[in-house]
């Protein structure tokens, strides 16, 4: 009986140690992902100045949501962290989403290429002019739910704005 208790205690200690290590590793991976996105963001704005700045936390939160912290197939195989679709016809420039040949997800050469594309999309594409205008007029954003509600053409999930707003909130406390 003593041997069983000792074995059980040892197993519990090992499992707890494994859980802590796994949690620490997960947190480190998340921090590394944020740093990578932030590095691309900073590089973009060192070169590009304009009348609209898309907030870093906005870009990062959408990348986190759309790519599952960079773990999605599209992020890993195509450096697509924002779920950007394409009409490209050359297979080198797209991946098929979920076996549906009609849904093509764009491929990028690097994470930074995708971050640059996303920022330009939001800042300059007429379909997102309400979003760009919001950021032009509101340099200090405290509630992102309003601006996220202007992105209906970007997402299909009706809960998407709330999910991304939740990520933004958690990043502001990170």
Predicted features and spans:
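Catalytic cores of secreted/periplasmic lytic hydrolases that degrade extracellular macromolecules
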Residues: 17-60, 65-174
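Bacterial Sec-dependent N-terminal signal peptides
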Residues: 1-24
């Amino acid at each position: 009986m003593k041997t069983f208790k000792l074995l059980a205690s040892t197993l519990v200690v090992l499992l707890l140690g494994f859980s802590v290590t796994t949690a620490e590793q997960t947190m480190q991976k998340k921090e590394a992902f944020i740093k990578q996105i932030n590095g691309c963001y900073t590089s973009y704005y060192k070169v590009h100045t304009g009348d609209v700045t898309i907030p870093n936390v906005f870009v990062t939160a959408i990348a986190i949501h759309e790519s599952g912290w960079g773990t999605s197939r599209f992020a890993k195989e195509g450096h697509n962290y924002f779920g950007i679709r394409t009409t490209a016809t050359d297979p080198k420039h797209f991946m098929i989403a979920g076996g549906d040949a009609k849904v093509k997800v764009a491929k990028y050469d690097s994470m930074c290429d995708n971050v640059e594309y996303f920022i330009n999309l939001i800042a300059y594409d007429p379909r997102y002019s309400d979003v760009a205008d919001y950021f032009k007029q509101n340099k200090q954003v405290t509630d992102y739910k309003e601006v996220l509600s202007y992105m209906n053409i970007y997402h299909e999930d009706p809960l998407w704005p709330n999910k991304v707003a939740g990520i933004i909130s958690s990043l502001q406390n990170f």
